């Protein structure tokens, strides 16, 4: 059985880890980095992922996708999506089913399809390290992701060619990474996870006893649309406003300028975590009739903190709710762990310290802990890690819509999973022959205020007065937090069930088609790689041949020289095209035309070899007459 890898599919950065010699190891990608920007770009002939995609974003803003995780499993009309529609340089559109999709070069794409490109890179990184094919993974999601978002993440894995063995919550993964080596005792840990696009707080009890470890999530809460991207956007808007005040031009209307502004804002934010002031200097940011314009703005740490103060305060309310749900007070928390790149901001650390009354731990890498935890969970599933039990929870309550548009809960939030629950309902009208089971997720009493996960009908109910038929509804949540629902007429035994699969917005057929497309692209990518290889070999041969022609000088007959130059010209022309066979044919023709050059080079080598041999003999004869001399080493202090 191959290795199961652990992947942190992040909003801003992603990371992959594997168990290596019993320890979780974070892997370096092809660029030599341990984290990969979650950025995907589409050009005329290829898909670019990670740092290379980030580098070209300024010149290709409309087809470069970042923070795609904020759209995964969401509806286009959601308030959070509408906010992003107005600030993202790329196009966010409504799919036929009402989901939020993106568009690039006329192609409409589902967020899981785009996210799959990042997962493919993580998969390839692991395969390069392990030297074998990888087909299974544990993928992390924010603890507060709903059923749709979890299912969409699983779909992304399938499209990338991975069987997702488990979906694990990010704070839980971080707690695994922190607690796996801890000795005896019972610890209650608060994991504050402020990433690029999402915020989670989880209260986790770690019980270590005689080599056995139990990680039990007591409560979780959060906001799936609050993270570092929002901090960046505050700074971007501030810079755009300052420029407008000074120059009278609105950079928000220029996608290229906004992409440069985004890069600069992100860089400035990072710098202000270690310095009190920085300068954003962007020459030639735009131009008008009077000429080019430059943006130069000084930003202090205090200014940045004032811009994002309300965002930091927004993270504190979920902390209070999670503690209340776990029936704990601040004094019950033994350790605080910070996860996610945005927690490097001193003001965030200060807010967390003030809330919990203790310093967060500094020995957990906020960028890598989640991937490490995913790799440990992968080890648990494969049997490589023993004596570890992970008890996670469902973050939101689950129920159905009942008479009066009320949500009736069957499973309360923070229930340990996997779990089952059942309840008997009845009809609302006399002689009702069918009931609609409308499945909801959320905490509101009003059904319409919660997230609709799907609905199905149970028909064939025998005519009877209202309230008489007995319809048993069963909810079953698996270890990934994904829901299966069934409804049974207890009198007839007729049953109808639904796995909330299409809640990701993609039908089984659509996912299967995307898997096929991804496989086809893999073949395309392979062909493209082979084409580039042929081009490189051809270029190298032309370069070497030119050098040999120069070195041969007059020794090369003019007729042969003309043939070689014509062959080189043919190679240079072929290299500009996309026909691999034509390039290889032209390359072979050049090799054959250069036969005379090879003869000249060999003759020259033999001549030089003979001369060197004669010189060596002369040198040896002289050496026989040499007498060794005594010597004394002169120390520096004697000089």
Swiss-Prot record:
CDD domains: ASKHA_NBD_HSP70_DnaK-like. Residues 603-618 have a biased composition (Low complexity). One of its GO terms (molecular function) is heat shock protein binding. Residues 625-639 have a biased composition (Acidic residues). Residues 603-639 are annotated as: Disordered. Induction: By stress conditions e.g. heat shock. One of its GO terms (cellular component) is cytosol. PROSITE patterns: HSP70_1, HSP70_2, HSP70_3. Keywords: ATP-binding, Chaperone, Nucleotide-binding, Phosphoprotein, Stress response. Transmembrane segments: none annotated. InterPro entries: ATPase_NBD, Chaperone_DnaK, Heat_shock_70_CS, HSP70_C_sf, HSP70_peptide-bd_sf, Hsp_70_fam. GO terms for biological process: chaperone cofactor-dependent protein refolding; protein refolding. Pfam families: HSP70. The keyword Aminoacyl-tRNA synthetase does not apply. The modification Phosphothreonine is found at residue 198. NCBIfam families: PRK00290.1, PRK05183.1, prok_dnaK. Belongs to the heat shock protein 70 family. Acts as a chaperone. This is Chaperone protein DnaK.
């Amino acid at each position: 059985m191959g290795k199961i890898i652990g992947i942190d599919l992040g909003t801003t950065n992603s990371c992959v880890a594997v168990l290596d010699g019993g320890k979780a190891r974070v892997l370096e990608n092809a660029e030599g980095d341990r984290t990969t920007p979650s950025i995907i770009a589409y050009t005329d002939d290829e898909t670019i992922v990670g740092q290379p995609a980030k580098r070209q974003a300024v010149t290709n803003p409309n087809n470069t996708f970042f923070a795609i995780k904020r759209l995964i499993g969401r509806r286009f009309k959601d308030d959070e999506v509408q906010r992003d529609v107005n600030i993202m340089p790329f196009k966010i559109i409504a799919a036929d089913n009402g989901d939020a999709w993106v568009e690039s070069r006329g192609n409409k794409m589902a967020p899981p399809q785009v996210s799959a490109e990042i997962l493919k890179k993580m998969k390839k990184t692991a395969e390069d390290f392990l030297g074998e094919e990888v087909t299974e993974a544990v993928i992390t999601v924010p603890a507060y992701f709903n059923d749709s978002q979890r299912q969409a993440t699983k779909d992304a894995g399938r499209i990338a060619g991975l069987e997702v063995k488990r979906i694990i919550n990010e704070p839980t993964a971080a707690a695994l990474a922190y607690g796996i080596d801890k000795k005896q005792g019972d610890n209650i840990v608060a994991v504050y996870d402020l990433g690029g696009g999402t915020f989670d707080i989880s209260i986790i009890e770690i019980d270590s006893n005689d080599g056995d470890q139990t990680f039990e999530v007591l409560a979780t809460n959060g906001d799936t649309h609050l993270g570092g991207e929002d901090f960046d956007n505050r700074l971007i808007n501030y810079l755009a406003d300052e420029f407008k005040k000074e120059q009278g031009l609105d950079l928000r209307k220029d996608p290229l300028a906004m992409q440069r502004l985004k890069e600069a804002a992100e860089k400035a934010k990072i710098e202000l975590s270690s310095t009190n002031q920085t300068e954003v200097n962007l020459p030639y940011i735009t131009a008008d009739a009077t000429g080019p314009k430059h943006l130069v703005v000084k930003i202090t740490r205090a200014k940045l903190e004032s811009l994002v103060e309300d965002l930091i305060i927004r993270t504190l309310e979920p902390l209070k709710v999670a503690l209340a749900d776990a029936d704990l007070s601040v004094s019950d928390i033994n350790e605080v762990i910070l996860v996610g790149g945005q927690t490097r901001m001193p003001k965030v650390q200060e807010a967390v310290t003030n809330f919990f009354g203790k310093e967060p731990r500094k020995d957990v890498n906020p960028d890598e802990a989640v991937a490490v935890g995913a790799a440990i969970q992968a080890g648990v599933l494969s049997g490589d890690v023993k004596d570890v039990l992970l008890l996670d929870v469902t973050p939101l309550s689950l129920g159905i819509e009942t008479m009066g548009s009320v949500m009736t809960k069957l499973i309360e939030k923070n229930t340990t999973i996997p779990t089952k629950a059942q309840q008997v309902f009845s009809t609302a009208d006399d002689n009702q022959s069918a009931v609609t089971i409308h499945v909801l997720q959320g905490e509101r009493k009003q059904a319409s205020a919660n997230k609709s996960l799907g609905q199905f009908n149970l028909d064939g109910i025998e005519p009877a007065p209202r309230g008489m038929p007995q319809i048993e509804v069963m909810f079953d949540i698996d270890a990934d937090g994904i829901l299966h629902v069934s409804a049974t007429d207890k009198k007839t035994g007729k049953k109808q069930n639904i796995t909330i699969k299409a809640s990701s917005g993609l039908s089984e057929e659509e996912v299967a088609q995307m898997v096929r497309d991804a496989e086809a692209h893999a073949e395309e990518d392979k062909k493209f790689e082979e084409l580039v290889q042929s081009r490189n070999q051809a270029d190298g041969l032309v370069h070497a041949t030119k050098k040999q022609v120069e070195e041969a000088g007059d020794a090369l007959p003019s007729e042969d020289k003309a043939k070689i130059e014509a062959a080189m010209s043919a190679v240079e022309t072929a290299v500009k095209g996309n026909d691999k066979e034509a390039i290889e044919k032209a390359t072979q023709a050049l090799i054959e035309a250069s036969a005379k050059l090879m003869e000249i080079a060999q003759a020259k080598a033999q001549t030089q070899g003979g001369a060197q041999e004669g010189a060596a003999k002369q040198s040896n004869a002289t050496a026989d007459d040499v007498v060794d001399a005594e010597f004394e080493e002169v120390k520096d202090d004697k000089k």
